[in-house]
Amino acid sequence: SGSFDPITLGHVDIVTRAAELVDEVVVGVAMNSAKNGIFSMDERVAFVNDAVADIPGVEVALVDGLLVDFCTEMGADAIIRGLRFGGDFDYELQMAHLNKAMSGIETILLPAGREFGTISSSMIRSAACNGGNVSEFVPEMVNAALHERFPH
């Protein structure tokens, strides 16, 4: 799960690899009140649906509340999270322990691919709003929406 504001090719890579490991992947699009988003929840869900449409065994759902509650409702056996280079590991490990303690659900951490390890949605937002070309980091639909949102 994530806020996917916007979804990046790094996210798509993690979903693709996760789908190779398990029978079914549910991508949870979550609200994150701590982040200032640029796209609405409906837009984000649409972008994620479009980006993962060709990956077998993947569905997209809205997460409203705790991730572990969502996982329990969906009958999930595990949470799969991507790790970028740098500081993600410590945070994700803490969350994995908390989620396990609250629900018994395990977390699988997948390292980002080399080409995606430094990409984050916040970096994409920052670059796009300042006129940067982010086309090699986001799905085509997202790139078009960013150009519409931040015309330069």
Outline where the language-model segments fall.
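Nucleotidyltransferase catalytic core that binds NTPs
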Residues: 1-152
